[in-house]
């Protein structure tokens, strides 16, 4: 395409292709192919350079920047010639390598040519700027052009897909992949834009809009779907401001003519986690920030949101604005798109509400309840907003979040949630709502885009994330990478299929390679059974599965077994990885943390159930199918694993499978998007980043595949034309030669590798690089040719110039000669005459020419006029022809349209014809059936008449019964009137209750359901009527009778409908009556709750009030239990409704609700009553309507009865139905009567209960009045005791809490003691049973001895039989010798054979004798070993039973041999049996399967040797082979059992690890409890300080009362003595406890001895193994409880220690204040009181600790005993195994001897005939069966040994733990004793200080008395002086 052709692209041309001048300049650039190379560089990855030298595998290159580097030869890559610079298809390059691809993309990107082809790929680089390459001009430029005709562009890919679809009639797909920010979404938009434009152009004008369907054209809708999907599916990421966080597959459907028909969208892998979490440089989905722009203020109010994103933490964790995005404009586009796509106004506001609710979810807060782990809401404001937006009840939602109901077994249980669990549930719900809403919007968009226009083909556009390799790769990355792996496999397969199809078409020999299989290992590792996804889904099924167990399963299954699965190498600074996968793009390390939770994606089912009942229709629709999916997994998906739910991975695989199926059914086109740099800088390309993407997105993979084949190809003509210069002599001149032959000759004559090219039918194919070499050779040849041509041309030019010079010289010579001659003759006279005549001759000729020209002119003028006239005529004809042509074109277009319409109509007619034919056939068949039935029914007509009369009688009975029901209804109506009057008096209390509205709505809904049921009945009758009208021809003879019957039945129906109405009214009355009674109960309950609140407020006043309140609470609980009992009774009544018929089901439900109305149906008021009346009126109106409908039906029936002649069959069915209805009505009436009676009884019971409740409430009122009076009395006491009670009440609570804890501990220990006693009793019973078993075993041993003696006797008989056999052998020998003399020469050979056999028999008999002797020794040795084995009673027991069976078989065999066979053969048979039984014992003990196989192979070889001598043994060998096969099967079975045992052992180890993790969790909880106790103790210390300050104030106020201090001193002395006495008692108790512990140890030792005896019975121990496991678990639980109680005791001790320190501090303060005696004495008294309380507490703690120590010692000793017994058993098993090993070695020798004897015996036995051989074979099979049984028993024994070994290890570990616990308890007791001693010493010191203070006190008191005496003396003196002064004054006055 030249520059002129590129002008059609307008301004975009310069961004699409280089100009011709640039291309020519590039080709003329100097280039040396031998030295131009790319070189590896650590900074830039690759650099251009010039090769300097190559030596020893090293290459020296000088880069263009002047730097010289030396690298390995494989680190340099050849450059392509300049003609390939900026090449549009990189697959055409000569040298296909990474740097060539990189620099080609880089140079094109620098010129802003962002699109480049790479084989089948179109690679696009993000320009980060706007380029004018998407205008309408560009769309038109690409339309209809082939790929090679236009520059690379996304429009070219789109147009090719469109044209392929039209020409090939095949669906197409465009696969667009790349990393985030690479431009996938933009290119997807451009593809859709192109299809929308082209599809709209190819069709006629826009169709008429369908009313109510959509707004805007289909093209507008397809384009408008993007803004909505982007708002809800796009977000800002680190690399991209508008990153699609989901994959999508958009199908654009076209009609047959290429017209755009419809579209639909499928989405994949929406990133839900972004809703609740964003990185710092990212933000959540655009819609959240668009809503908060404030563009629509009414939305802010409707959604209860603000314009500040930081008010919503869930969406403001990262950035909140994006520079490149205007949220206001985007919001306008989103809102407009919703309207264009046809969403209704309700749906639109629902979408916004749910979006706002998701934002509010992040503001919900929860806190932990005090002293509990249970979460509770921290405020309900946010919950109220969410509930409003989602159409829920906020209280129900919070309850469901904090207390969800879960299914445990078959019951629903309420479960408490912690704060983290609730927060996780809230996050999961918000993500689920957002995801479901997004998927619903996609479905709605698809519905709107489905225009119902005819569509034939589609083009799919896949926009999905590319391969991802991050530092932290999780499940999402695995899904994305797996998707890309599948897509790359699809591409590889498709690409090389196309390549190889071309090879096949061109006839090139090529072995097919499926490059899709290159990725099979990784794909199968992920998706096949026992792959990663399979194991992940399997782990999700197990409730106790963890990430660790998942990792272990992965490693066990694949590590070391699958090459693609590797163990990651730990790297510094990177996240931990658990496994690595080898993908086509590289090895990726995956972290599996949280995969199980992500895969299960759990939701709070309680909240989901609320969603399903939401008043917001969209939300209810989103979760409508959630319950069904959770319960059954869907009907169609029942085959899936688990069945109960569908995991994320399973759903992902299902969607991926559908996607791949879609893609495989299409012709794909591939687009790969690249990010040039991380900084979003236009024009900059980072080499490392681009190469990484090229590897990830498969471009380099495609190049790799290209290099496998022949990527370069040229047509033969082009090749011949271009490369003919290489050897022109091969192609002869002047004669025709085929281009292919010429190319073959040309290539054959050139010095190149002839394996690097192939010849096709039309092209020659080259391997990568060969074409470049040919180009180099051509350049060199052209250089030589040009040089030669230049030389030839120069020579030719010079020769031509020389010739011209010579000719010029000759001309000059000739001119000079002529001029000289003229000068000589010009003056001659004749010459002058010639000069005069010459002009005259010329003028005459001119006149003649002029005359001729005039004639020509006239002639031409006439021709011109004729031509003009003819031209005019032709023009007129042309105009008319053009007009006709246009008319014909219009007719052709109209005819083509008519033809297409006719074809469509023809197709429709054909389809309708087929359907009508099928219907006709069905109708004919049905007509035949109806005729047969009619013939039968004419005979049954008379029976119908009789039955109709019976029906009339039954209807009369029904009328009587209904009359009774109507009377009862009037009675209930009167009751209702009375009850409604009582309801009016209680309106005020009823007004407070708001829940009645919901109940009323439910009742209304039920009434509507009743109405619907009646309408269904009417519909049923209508259908029956239509059937009757269709079947009317055969009933004309019985018209009147059938008419009367129908009228009677209709009357009965009307009566029944009236009864139904009456029954419904009676139900309503009963409901009102019940509600009134329940209302009273509710009122009383409300009063009770008020009383309870008052009583709880006054609980702190004293123990008496608390007791009374507890009594009231107990009474209330009794009342609640009675209410619950009443509810249970009502539930029982409800169950009785299940037996009613289907048509009266609604009536029975109402009756049951009357018997079981819930508490929500209590309060009724006048408004509700009015609604009830309205409902009744509606019901009456509906009944009237039904009656009118029924009357209309009857009228229609009466009109159509005249035509009912031929339909006797239908009447028969009607009769049967009526009979059924009659029986049902009878049953219903009986049930109604019984239900009415039951309701009446229930009503009477309820009234009685109400009266009793009222009496009880009146009693409670009186009691509450008394309580109030007592409270008033106590208020006065409270004022006096406020200060003391405030302090001591807290202490009392603490002590009570401590006492309750100690009491619980004591109860727990008591239960443990009882359990231990019970276990001891069980062990004693087991011991007795074992003793009995020992006795029976001894008895069996005696029997075995007797059997052994009998066996010795049998052995002697065998020896006698053997001697007899020897004599018989001698006789046979002599007999054969004599016969040999008499026989002829023909039998000579047979005689020799028999003699040889006799000799062999003698040798075998001798060997048998020696083996018998050795067997006897073996038996003696085995007897000694049997006596040794008698120690193990259990093994001896089983062995005795086995030997008993074998002995009986042995006796039978002996008897048969005595009767039928020679005694020598009997001896051999017995030896054989005994040898085989010994070998089975050996197999049993050692599980030696391999030796058994060797043994059988030896048998097979020896039998083959015998076959050479005796041909009759062939059958026996076959049987032996079969037995070997069976034994091999047995071996495989045992090996499978072994693997099962191994898996069981691994599961047990996993369980042990799980239990250890539980112990760690318990210890962590204990630490938390300990910290909590420390905190509480700190609070108690503060309270102690407060008490101390209060005591100080009291002391200051009592300084004046010295006498009371004396009394207090005496009290202190008494307290001291009491404390000393208590301490002595505690010491005595401690010594008693120690003695009791010693006694318990003795008892434990006795029990240990008993248990040792009991453990001798092995079978009993095996049966008790499970019990022991349970005991271990119980011991562990008890240990955990003990540890918790020990921590509590420690906390209490620490508290006591703090109290002691406080006391010491107070004593120091007292010593400092020597002058304040009263305060010091008082503090000492307080300290003594506190110490006394502490001592009492310590005494209780010591008792508990001692008890704990006893229990722990008992457990430890029991565990030690168990461990010792298990160790002893293990040792015995080991001894037994060693003993059996020795037996095995001895028996191996014996087995070999016996085997030899067996072979010889078999050879002898063959002489006895085939009959004997068959018996031997049957015996062999029996023995082989015994071998298998013994092998199974051996395997069981090995299992038992392993179990006991594990048990010994567990008990040893438990023993060590118990020992540690005992040591800790002993240390605790010692510490307590030390503390008691310290307290004693402190008391003595306090006593000494008290004495010192008393002495000082006495001294001061004595000084005070002296001062008082001095004061008295002074006072007396003063009085005297006053008296004197008064006397003196009086004397003065008198004077």
UniProtKB/Swiss-Prot annotation:
Recorded coiled-coil stretches: 840-1935
GO MF annotation list: actin filament binding; ATP binding; calmodulin binding; microfilament motor activity
Domain Myosin N-terminal SH3-like, chain residue ranges per copy: 32-81
The keyword Glycoprotein is assigned to this record: no
Main subcellular location: cytoplasm
Basic and acidic residues composition bias: residue spans: 1902-1913, 1924-1935
SUPFAM superfamilies: Myosin rod fragments, P-loop containing nucleoside triphosphate hydrolases, Tropomyosin
Domain of life of the source: Eukaryota
GO cellular component: myofibril; myosin filament; myosin II complex
Residues annotated to bind ATP: 178-185
Localization, UniProt: Cytoplasm, Myofibril
Modified residues (N6,N6,N6-trimethyllysine): 129
Keywords, ordered alphabetically: Actin-binding, ATP-binding, Calmodulin-binding, Coiled coil, Cytoplasm, Methylation, Motor protein, Muscle protein, Myosin, Nucleotide-binding, Thick filament
Domain Myosin motor: 85-779
Keyword Transport part of the UniProt annotation: no
Domain named IQ: residues: 782-811
Annotated region (Actin-binding), positions in chain: 659-681, 761-775
InterPro entries: Kinesin_motor_dom_sf, Myosin_head_motor_dom-like, Myosin_N, Myosin_S1_N, Myosin_tail, P-loop_NTPase, XRCC4-like_C
Disulfide topology: none
GO BP terms, alphabetized: system development
Functional description taken from the UniProt entry: Muscle contraction.
Protein family according to the UniProt entry: Belongs to the TRAFAC class myosin-kinesin ATPase superfamily. Myosin family.
Note on domains (UniProt): The rodlike tail sequence is highly repetitive, showing cycles of a 28-residue repeat pattern composed of 4 heptapeptides, characteristic for alpha-helical coiled coils. Limited proteolysis of myosin heavy chain produces 1 light meromyosin (LMM) and 1 heavy meromyosin (HMM). HMM can be further cleaved into 2 globular subfragments (S1) and 1 rod-shaped subfragment (S2).
Subunit record text: Muscle myosin is a hexameric protein that consists of 2 heavy chain subunits (MHC), 2 alkali light chain subunits (MLC) and 2 regulatory light chain subunits (MLC-2).
Entry protein name: Myosin heavy chain, fast skeletal muscle
Species per Swiss-Prot/TrEMBL record: Cyprinus carpio (Common carp)
């Amino acid at each position: 395409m030249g520059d002129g052709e590129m002008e059609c692209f307008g301004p975009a041309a310069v961004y699409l292709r280089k100009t011709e001048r640039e291309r020519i300049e590039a080709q003329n650039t100097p280039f040396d192919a031998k030295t131009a190379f790319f070189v590896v560089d650590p900074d830039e990855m690759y650099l251009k350079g010039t090769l300097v030298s190559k030596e020893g595998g090293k290459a020296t290159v000088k880069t263009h920047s002047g730097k010289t580097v030396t690298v390995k030869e494989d680190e340099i890559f050849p450059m392509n010639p300049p003609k390939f610079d900026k090449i549009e298809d990189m697959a055409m390059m000569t040298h296909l390598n990474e740097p060539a691809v990189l620099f080609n993309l880089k140079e094109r990107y620098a010129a802003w040519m962002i699109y480049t082809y790479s084989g089948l790929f179109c690679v696009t680089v993000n320009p980060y700027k706007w380029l004018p390459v998407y205008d309408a001009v560009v769309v038109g430029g690409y339309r209809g052009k082939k790929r090679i005709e236009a520059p690379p562009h996304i429009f070219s890919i789109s147009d090719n897909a469109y044209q392929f679809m039209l020409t090939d009639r095949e669906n197409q797909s465009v696969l667009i992949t790349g990393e985030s920010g690479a431009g996938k979404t933009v290119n997807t938009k451009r593809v859709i834009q192109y299809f929308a434009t082209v599809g709209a152009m190819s069709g006629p004008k826009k169709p008429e809009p369908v009313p109510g369907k959509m707004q805007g054209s289909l093209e507008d809708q397809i384009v408008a779907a993007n803004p909505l999907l982007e708002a809800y599916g796009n977000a800002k990421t680190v690399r991209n401001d508008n990153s699609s966080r989901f994959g999508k597959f958009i199908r654009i459907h076209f009609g047959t003519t290429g017209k755009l028909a419809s579209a639909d969208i499928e989405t994949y892998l929406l990133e839900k986690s972004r809703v609740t979490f964003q990185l710092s440089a990212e933000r959540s989905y655009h819609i959240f920030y668009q809503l908060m722009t404030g563009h629509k203020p009414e939305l802010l109010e409707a959604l209860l949101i603000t314009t500040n994103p930081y008010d919503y933490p869930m969406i403001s964790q990262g950035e909140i604005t994006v520079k490149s995005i205007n949220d206001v404009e985007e919001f306008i586009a989103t809102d407009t798109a919703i309207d264009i796509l046809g969403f209704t106004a309700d749906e639109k506001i629902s979408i916004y509400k749910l979006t706002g609710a998701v934002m509010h979810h992040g503001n919900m807060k929860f806190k932990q309840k005090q002293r509990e782990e249970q979460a509770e809401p921290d405020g309900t404001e946010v919950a109220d907003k969410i509930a409003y937006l989602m159409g829920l009840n906020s209280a129900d939602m919070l309850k469901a979040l904090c207390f969800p109901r879960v299914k445990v077994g078959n019951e629903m249980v309420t479960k408490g949630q912690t704060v983290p669990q609730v927060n996780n549930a809230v996050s999961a719900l918000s993500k689920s709502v957002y995801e479901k809403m997004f998927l619903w919007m996609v479905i709605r968009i698809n519905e709107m885009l489905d225009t119902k226009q005819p569509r034939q083909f589609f083009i799919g556009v896949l926009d999905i994330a590319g391969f991802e390799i991050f530092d932290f790769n999780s499940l999402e990355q695995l899904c994305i990478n797996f998707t890309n792996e599948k897509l790359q496999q699809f591409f590889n397969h498709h690409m090389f299929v196309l390549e190889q199809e071309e090879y096949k078409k061109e006839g090139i020999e090529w072995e097919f390679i499926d490059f899709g299989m290159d990725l099979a290992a990784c794909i199968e590792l992920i998706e096949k059974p026992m792959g990663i996804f399979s194991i992940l889904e399997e782990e999700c099924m197990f409730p106790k599965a963890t990430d660790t167990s998942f990792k272990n399963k992965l490693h066990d299954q694949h590590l070391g077994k699958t090459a693609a699965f590797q163990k990651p190498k730990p790297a510094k600074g990177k996240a931990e990885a658990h496994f690595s996968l080898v993908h086509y793009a590289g090895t990726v390390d995956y972290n599996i943390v949280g995969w199980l939770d992500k895969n299960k994606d759990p939701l709070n089912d309680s909240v989901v159930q609320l969603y399903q009942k939401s008043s917001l229709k969209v939300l209810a629709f989103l979760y409508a199918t959630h319950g069904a999916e959770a319960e059954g997994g869907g009907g169609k998906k029942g085959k899936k694993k688990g069945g109960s739910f569908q995991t994320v991975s399973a759903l992902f695989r299902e969607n991926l499978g559908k996607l791949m199926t879609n893609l495989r059914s299409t012709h794909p086109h591939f687009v790969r998007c690249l990010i040039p740099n991380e900084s979003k800088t236009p024009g900059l390309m980072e080499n490392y980043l681009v190469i990484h993407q090229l590897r990830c997105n498969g471009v380099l993979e495609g190049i790799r595949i290209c290099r496998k084949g022949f990527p370069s190809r040229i047509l033969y003509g082009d090749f011949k034309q271009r490369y003919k210069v290489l050897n022109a002599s091969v192609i002869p001149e002047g004669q025709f030669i085929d281009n292919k032959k010429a190319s073959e000759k040309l290539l054959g004559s050139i010095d190149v590798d002839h394996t690097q090219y192939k010849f096709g039918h039309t092209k020659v194919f080259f391997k990568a690089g060969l074409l470049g070499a040919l180009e180099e050779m051509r350049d060199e040849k052209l250089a030589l040719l040009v040089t030669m041509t230049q030389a030839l041309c120069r020579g030719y030019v010079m020769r031509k110039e020389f010739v011209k010079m010579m000719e010029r010289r000759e001309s000059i010579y000739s001119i000079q000669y002529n001029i000289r001659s003229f000068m000589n003759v010009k003056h001659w006279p004749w010459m002058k005459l010639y000069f005069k005549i010459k002009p005259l001759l010329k003028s005459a000729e001119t006149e003649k020419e002029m005359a001729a020209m005039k004639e020509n002119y006239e002639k031409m003028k006439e021709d011109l006029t004729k031509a003009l006239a003819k031209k005019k005529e032709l023009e007129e004809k042309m105009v008319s022809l053009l007009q006709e042509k246009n008319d014909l074109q219009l007719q052709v277009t109209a005819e083509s349209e008519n033809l297409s319409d006719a074809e469509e109509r023809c197709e429709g007619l054909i389809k309708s014809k087929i359907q009508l034919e099928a219907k006709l056939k069905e109708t004919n068949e049905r007509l035949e059936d109806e005729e047969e039935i009619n013939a039968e029914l004419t005979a049954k007509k008379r029976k119908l008449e009789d039955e109709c009369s019976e029906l009339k009688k039954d209807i009369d009975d029904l009328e009587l019964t209904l009359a009774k029901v109507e009377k009862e209804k009037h009675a209930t109506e009167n009751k209702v009137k009375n009850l409604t009057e009582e309801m009016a008096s209680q309106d005020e209390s009823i007004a407070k209750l708001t829940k009645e509205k919901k109940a009323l709505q439910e009742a209304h809904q039920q009434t509507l359901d009743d109405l619907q049921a009646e309408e269904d009945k009417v519909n049923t009758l209508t259908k029956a009527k239509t059937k009757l009208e269709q079947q009317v021809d055969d009933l004309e003879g019985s018209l009147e009778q059938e008419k009367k019957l129908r009228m009677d039945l209709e009357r009965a129906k009307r009566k029944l409908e009236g009864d139904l109405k009456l029954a419904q009214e009676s139900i309503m009355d009963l409901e009102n009556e019940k509600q009134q009674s329940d209302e009273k109960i509710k009122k009383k309950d409300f009063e009770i709750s008020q009383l309870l609140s008052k009583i709880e407020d006054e609980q702190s006043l004293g123990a008496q009030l608390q007791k009374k309140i507890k009594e009231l609470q107990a009474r209330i609980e009794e009342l609640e239990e009675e209410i619950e009992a009443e509810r249970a009774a009502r539930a029982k009544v409800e169950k009785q409704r299940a037996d009613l018929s289907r048509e009266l089901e609604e009536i029975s439900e109402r009756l049951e609700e009357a018997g079981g109305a819930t508490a929500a149906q209590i309060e009724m008021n006048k408004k509700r009553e009015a609604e009830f009346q309205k409902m009744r009126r509606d019901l009456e109106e509906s009944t009237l309507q039904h009656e009118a409908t029924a009357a209309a039906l009857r009228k229609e029936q009466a009109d159509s009865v005249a035509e009912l002649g031929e339909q006797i069959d239908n009447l028969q069915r009607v009769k049967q139905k009526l009979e059924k209805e009659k029986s049902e009505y009878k049953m219903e009436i009986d049930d109604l009567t019984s239900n009415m009676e039951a309701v009446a009884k229930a009503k009477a019971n309820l009234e009685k209960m109400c009266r009793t409740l009222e009496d009880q409430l009146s009693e409670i009122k009186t009691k509450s009045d008394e309580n109030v009076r007592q409270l008033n009395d106590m208020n006065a006491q409270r004022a006096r005791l406020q200060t003391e009670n405030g302090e001591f009440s807290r202490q009392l609570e603490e002590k009570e809490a401590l006492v309750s804890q100690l009491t619980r501990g004591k109860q727990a220990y008591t239960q443990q003691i009882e359990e231990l006693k019970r276990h001891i009793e069980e062990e004693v019973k087991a011991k007795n049973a074992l003793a009995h078993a020992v006795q029976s075993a001894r008895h069996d041993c005696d029997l075995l001895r007797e059997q052994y003696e009998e066996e010795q006797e049998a052995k002697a008989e065998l020896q006698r039989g053997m001697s007899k056999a020897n004599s018989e052998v001698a006789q046979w020998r002599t007999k054969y010798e004599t016969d040999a003399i008499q026989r002829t020469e023909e039998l000579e050979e047979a005689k020799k054979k028999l003699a040889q056999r006799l000799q062999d028999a003698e040798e075998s008999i001798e060997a048998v004798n020696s083996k018998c002797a050795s067997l006897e020794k073996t038996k003696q040795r085995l007897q000694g070993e049997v006596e040794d084995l008698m120690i193990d009673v259990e093994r001896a027991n089983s062995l005795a039973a086995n030997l008993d069976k074998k002995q009986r078989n042995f006796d039978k065999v002996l008897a048969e041999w005595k009767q039928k066979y020679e005694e020598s053969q009997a001896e051999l048979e017995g030896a054989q049996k005994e040898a085989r039984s010994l070998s089975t014992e050996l197999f049993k003990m050692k599980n030696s399967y391999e030796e058994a196989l060797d043994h059988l192979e030896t048998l097979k070889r020896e039998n083959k040797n015998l076959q050479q001598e005796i041909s009759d043994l062939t059958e026996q060998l076959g049987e032996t082979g079969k037995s070997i096969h069976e034994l091999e099967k047995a071996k495989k079975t045992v090996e499978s059992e072994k693997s099962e045992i191994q898996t069981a052992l691994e599961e047990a180890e996993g369980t042990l690890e799980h239990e250890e993790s539980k112990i760690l969790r318990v210890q962590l909880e204990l630490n938390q409890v300990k910290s909590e106790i420390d905190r509480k103790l700190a609070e108690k210390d503060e309270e102690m300080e407060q008490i101390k300050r209060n005591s100080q104030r009291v002391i200051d106020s009592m300084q004046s009362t010295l006498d009371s201090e004396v009394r207090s001193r005496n009290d202190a002395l008494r307290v001291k003595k009491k404390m000393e006495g208590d301490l002595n008692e505690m010491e005595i108790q401690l010594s008693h406890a120690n003695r009791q512990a010693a006694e318990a140890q003795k008892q434990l030792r006795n029990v240990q001895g008993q248990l040792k005896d009991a453990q001798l019975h092995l079978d009993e121990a095996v049966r008790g193994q499970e019990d022991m496991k349970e005991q271990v678990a119980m011991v562990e639980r008890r240990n955990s409880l003990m540890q918790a109680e020990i921590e509590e005791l420690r906390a209490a001790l620490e508290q006591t220690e703090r109290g002691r320190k406080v006391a010491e501090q107070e004593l120091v303060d007292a010593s400092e204040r020597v002058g304040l005696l009263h305060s010091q004495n008082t503090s000492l008294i307080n300290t003594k009181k506190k110490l006394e309380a502490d001592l009492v507490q310590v005494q209780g703690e010591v008792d508990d600790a001692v008890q704990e120590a006893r229990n722990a010692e008992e457990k430890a000793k029991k565990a030690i005993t168990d461990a010792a017994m298990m160790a002893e058993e293990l040792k015995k098993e080991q001894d037994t195994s060693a003993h059996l090993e020795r037996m095995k070695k001895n028996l191996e020798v014996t087995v070999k001897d016996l085997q030899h004897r067996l072979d010889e015996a078999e050879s002898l036995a063959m002489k006895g005939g085939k009959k004997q051989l068959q018996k031997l074979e049957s015996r062999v099979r029996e023995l082989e069966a015994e071998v298998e049984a013994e092998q199974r028993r051996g395997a069981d024994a090995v299992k038992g040994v392993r179990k006991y070994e594990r048990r010994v290890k567990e008990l040893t570990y438990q023993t060590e733990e118990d020992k540690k616990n005992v040591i800790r308890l002993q240390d605790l007791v010692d510490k307590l004793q030390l503390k008691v001693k310290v307290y004693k010493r402190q008391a003595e010191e306090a006593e000494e200080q008290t004495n010192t203070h008393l002495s000082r006190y006495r001294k001061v008191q004595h000084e005070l008395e002296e001062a008082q005496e001095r004061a008295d003396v002074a006072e007396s003196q003063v009085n005297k002086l006053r008296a004197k002064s008064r006397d003196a004054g009086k004397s003065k006055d008198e004077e």
